[in-house]
C-alpha cells in the first residue's frame, strides 16, 4: 500500500522535585567504602549488603555542614533563622543540628495595599 506507521519517542526529565527526592534518598543510604591494598573497593561495614550499580558509594565522609568550615566554604547554621513549627529543611530541629536554639517573637508591619 506504500504507507508506513511512525512512532516517535520523547525523552524528558522527570519532575525536578522527584529527581531531588531520589538523589537525597540515595545520598542518605550511600555505602561507605574503602580501598584495599589490592586496589579494590570494599564495604567499610561488612554487615551491609554490597552496593548495586544503582547505589551511591563514597570513600570520604561528608563535612559537617552544621559547623563553620573555611576549607569547605561552609558557613554553618549558627545564627540562621529557622521555623520552629516546620519539620522541613527550614525547621529548627534539623537546621540547628540538635544544638538548641534561641526563641523570639517579632511583629512585622507591612503595607498590604488593601482596598475596601
UniProtKB/Swiss-Prot annotation:
Disulfide bonds, paired cysteine numbers: 82-97
One protein family per Pfam: wnt
GO-annotated molecular function: cytokine activity; frizzled binding
The keyword NAD appears for this protein: no
Any one of the GO BP annotations: canonical Wnt signaling pathway
Post-translational modification: Palmitoleoylation is required for efficient binding to frizzled receptors. Depalmitoleoylation leads to Wnt signaling pathway inhibition.
Residues carrying sugar: 69, 83
Keywords per UniProt: Developmental protein, Disulfide bond, Extracellular matrix, Glycoprotein, Lipoprotein, Secreted, Wnt signaling pathway
Keyword Secreted assigned: yes
GO CC terms of this entry: extracellular space
Location of the protein in the cell: Secreted, Extracellular space, Extracellular matrix
Lipidated residues (O-palmitoleoyl serine): 1
Function: Ligand for members of the frizzled family of seven transmembrane receptors. Probable developmental protein. May be a signaling molecule which affects the development of discrete regions of tissues. Is likely to signal over only few cell diameters.
Family of the protein in this entry: Belongs to the Wnt family.
Name this protein carries in UniProt: Protein Wnt-5b
Organism encoding this protein: Alopias vulpinus (Common thresher shark)
